[in-house]
Structure formats: C-alpha cells, structure tokens
A protein has these predicted regions:
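Conserved short alpha-helical segments that host acidic/polar catalytic motifs at enzyme active sites
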Residues: 1-226
C-alpha cells in the first residue's frame, strides 16, 4: 500500500517531515522519500528501505534540507515523491492507491498529446508519474486533479506541493484516508493521524471522498468539494 504526509509551515518543517514520514513506515516496505521546497527549488531524496529502517537511510540527507513546506512518501513500489515541471508550474507530487487501467491511460495520453514516460525496473510505469501526466492536462492544478480522479479506475490519493502551498486530494471512493492536522503556524495532511501527536499536531478533520484541500501555513481551504 503506502502512505503520504505533507506540511505547510511558517517555520522549518524538515524534522516534522522526517519523523512524520517515518511514522508511516509500517504502511510500505520498499521505498521512502522526502522532498522539501527550498529557496533554490526542490530538494528530494529517495531510498530503498527494504533492508534498513527509514531513519538510518535519511538522517544524513536531512542535514542538507531546509524549508517550510515538504512532502514525504512510503511506498511498496514506486519511487516518490517526484518533481515535475509543467505548464502549471513546477511542483512535487506523491500518491497512494491503485490504478487498474494504467495501460489504457498511457495509450490515451500518448495518442492525444506529446508524452513520454520513464520505465522503472521491471518495465512498469510509475503510478505517480502517470497521475502527474494527467494533472498536466488540466487548466490548473485543481482541474488536473479532478481529471486524474475521473480517469483513474481504482483509487488514488494525491499530495501536490507547489510554491504557493500544498494540495491534498483524497481518492474518489474514500478508500484511503487523508487527514488534516494543525498546530500554531502550520498545517499538515497525512494518511494516518497517528503521526500527529508525536510531532505536535492536533487532528482537525478528515477529507471526504474526492475532496481537494489547499493548505498554507495560515489556512486549510477546500478548493474541490467532496
């Protein structure tokens, strides 16, 4: 399966992201990843965690990270988060879920517009890359997320980190939870609220199926109704 977590804070959030992602480690066994938005762009790190715990893999990486917004992911398959440069601007993205019609979506994208996909080991296509390609067909990030939600057969929960804030979108069937937490000067979205108490956040609410929220350090705003 997997888990995701993201932060929008007035203060440096690297340690919250580090521990918050680690607290999701029981949801996946293969890969972990973190991405921080810094003044000079995105700083991303991904490691295989099959044979070593998350913390030992990333404790050196976080020394080179500094920023107030970031996302993390634990995965049983796809390496993520990914960084994307598109007509909607640059962003980082992480997902959780299952896409049952992946081949159909790939063929549709290749037919309708210039597209290319990086092949992973084993010949598959990264689910998160595919979702990003769908988002890029939209007028903006919210419209792109709606397109992805409509096209995917199965379920996909999405975090998109932009320079303006964090988009958090729950899958359309509500199969994978996405929960909003809050502390003074910061908001976060996570697959599990278990992490909140350990990093000083309090439960605020759970997104409804297909709901899209936009988080900044000052607010949690619904920008796509459930």
């Amino acid at each position: 399966m997997g888990g995701v977590i993201g932060f929008a804070s007035k203060q440096d959030c690297v340690m919250d992201l580090f521990f918050g992602t680690d607290y999701h480690s029981h949801l996946g066994t293969k890969r972990g990843g973190m991405c921080i938005l810094q003044e000079d762009g995105f700083n991303r790190s991904i490691h295989n965690i099959e044979n070593s715990p998350f913390r030992s893999k990333f404790e050196q990486d976080i020394e080179e990270m500094k920023g107030n917004m970031g996302i993390g992911a634990i995965s049983d398959g796809d390496p993520q988060p990914l960084t994307v440069y598109s007509r909607q601007g640059d962003y980082a993205i992480a997902t959780v879920g299952r896409i049952n019609n992946k081949d159909e979506i790939v063929q549709e994208l290749l037919k309708d517009r210039p597209s290319q996909f990086m092949s992973m080991s084993g010949g598959g296509i990264n689910n998160t890359e595919l979702v990003a390609a769908l988002i890029s067909t939209g007028r903006d990030i919210v419209d792109g997320i709606r397109i992805a939600q409509a096209k995917v057969e199965g379920s996909v929960t999405i975090l998109v980190l932009t320079r303006e804030g964090l988009y958090a979108a729950r899958d359309k069937y509500g199969r994978t939870p996405l929960i909003i937490g809050h502390k003074d000067g910061a908001y976060c979205a996570a697959s599990e609220s278990f992490a909140f108490i350990n990093i000083g956040y309090k439960y605020k609410r759970e997104l409804g199926p297909a709901e899209i929220a936009f988080l900044t350090p000052d607010e949690d705003k619904t920008v796509g109704e459930p």
